[in-house]
Amino acid sequence: MKVYDCCDLVRELYSQIGSGDQGYIPKAITCAVKTLNDLAADESLPKEARDRAAFAAANLLISDFED
C-alpha cells in the first residue's frame, strides 16, 4: 500500500512526520500492533471494527517483519 492510497488523516500525519512536525517512532510495527491490540480490546467499539483490528494485529505478529 502506498501513502496516496490512504485516507486524508493518514496522509496528513505522514506529511507531518516527514517534515519533522510530528515524532517518528522507529519501532513502527510494534507501535502498530499495540495500537491494533488496543482497538481490538476496546469493547466500546463496534465488533466489526474490533475484529478487523484483531485480524490485522494477528497478521502483523505472524509476518516475518520485525522492528
Swiss-Prot record:
It comes from the Bacteria. InterPro entries: UPF0253 (IPR009624). Pfam families: UPF0253 (PF06786). Coiled coil: none annotated. Belongs to the UPF0253 family. HAMAP family: UPF0253. This is UPF0253 protein VS_2370.
